[in-house]
A protein has these predicted regions:
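An N-terminal, well-structured beta->alpha segment
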Residues: 1-39, 183-190
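Accessory alpha-helical/coil subdomains and C-terminal extensions
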Residues: 182-202, 208, 225, 230
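Glycine-rich phosphate-binding loops that contact phosphosugars or nucleotide phosphates
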Residues: 25, 34-183, 212, 247, ...
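Short gly/ser/thr-rich secondary-structure transition/capping motifs
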Residues: 23-27, 71-77, 189-192, 237-241
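Acidic catalytic cores of enzymes that act on phosphate-bearing nucleotides/polynucleotides
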Residues: 203-267, 278-280
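Flexible, glycine/charged-enriched surface loops at secondary-structure junctions
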Residues: 5, 173-179, 197-199, 236-237
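Acidic/glycine-enriched edge-of-secondary-structure segments
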Residues: 9-19, 61-70, 176-185, 223-234
Length: 288
């Protein structure tokens, strides 16, 4: 078994640990948000964690009275003055596998000096370089991926941002949805692995992932996984926006994965008909 495969198969167990960890830290999270009542968030990441930062920002910005922005740490350190007003007065959330990425550490040091913002890190390595700079550290050392491409780590970081948002917003429904996904993850893997094997055996050599809303970042990370693991071209686009230009490169050997949102059928169905007409295999993922 390949290392990446083993890490993916371990995801249900690691998600269970992550959910337990957040339950154990519930009082710490409550205290942090009581002491820091800003309604503004800046989420920093690099690479995969920046993609997750975009999903996190989308989610937090949807909460009542809350604004949120995702910034690539490398973008920030190139021109911190440009981001001055964006970051000022915010809670800074840092997503990182190692917690040692130089751009992340430099960016947080600058933000602390320039703004004194409270900071929360979510990482998978204990004793990392971000921890001494943060006001709250959430360390998920059971889901650290040794593979170059993050899989299990990404899933757990994403779940962590959902649980953090649930605590911030006191949203029990969001928290329960994460717990439900965790409980069903093993059966989900077993049910769909044969289907995934069939899809893998189809004739395709490039991938497009389509998604909107709070899953946009993790969808983009999914496209990156095809590039890093399969060494094929993987691209991400917003669902309906795909029609406005990028669809012209879709062909008979383009595998399209579309994450459809519940509650709207007409527009999404019309978009999928356009994609199907391009001739390549199409897979839809939706919540029934």
């Amino acid at each position: 078994m390949f290392l990446t495969e083993a890490e993916i198969l371990d995801t249900p167990l690691s998600l269970n640990y992550t959910c337990q960890y957040f339950e154990k830290n519930k009082k710490n999270l409550e205290q942090f948000f009581q002491e820091n009542q800003q309604k503004k968030f800046t989420i920093l990441g690099c690479g995969s964690s920046y993609m997750l930062a975009k999903s996190t920002a989308s989610l937090f910005a949807s909460l009542l009275g809350t604004s949120a922005n995702a910034i690539a740490a490398g973008d920030y350190i190139v021109d911190p003055l440009f981001w001055y007003e964006t970051v000022k007065g915010s809670i800074v959330l840092l997503l990182s596998r190692s917690g040692k990425t130089s751009e992340m550490v430099w960016a947080l040091k600058h933000i602390k000096e320039a703004h004194g913002c409270p900071a929360v890190s979510i990482t998978t390595e204990d004793g990392n370089d971000l921890m001494p700079l943060c006001d709250l550290n959430l360390t998920l050392n059971w889901c650290h991926d040794d593979s170059v491409c993050q899989t299990r780590t990404v899933t757990n970081l994403y779940a962590s941002t959902l649980l953090l948002a649930a605590e911030y917003a006191r949203d029990d429904r969001l928290r329960e949805s994460v717990l439900a996904a965790m409980r069903e993850s093993t059966s989900f893997q077993l049910k769909y692995r044969p289907v995934l094997a069939e899809i893998a055996n189809l004739d395709w050599d490039n991938v497009v992932v389509l998604a909107d809303g709070p899953i946009c970042g993790i969808a983009e990370e999914g496209a990156l996984a095809f590039t890093e693991i399969s060494m094929l071209t993987g691209r991400y686009f917003h669902l309906l926006d795909y029609r406005h230009g990028p669809i012209v490169v879709s062909g008979k050997r383009t595998l399209t994965l579309a994450l459809l949102r519940p509650g709207e059928e007409k527009l999404q169905s019309a978009m999928m008909k356009d994609v199907i007409q391009r001739g390549g295999p199409v897979v839809t993922i939706s919540h029934c």
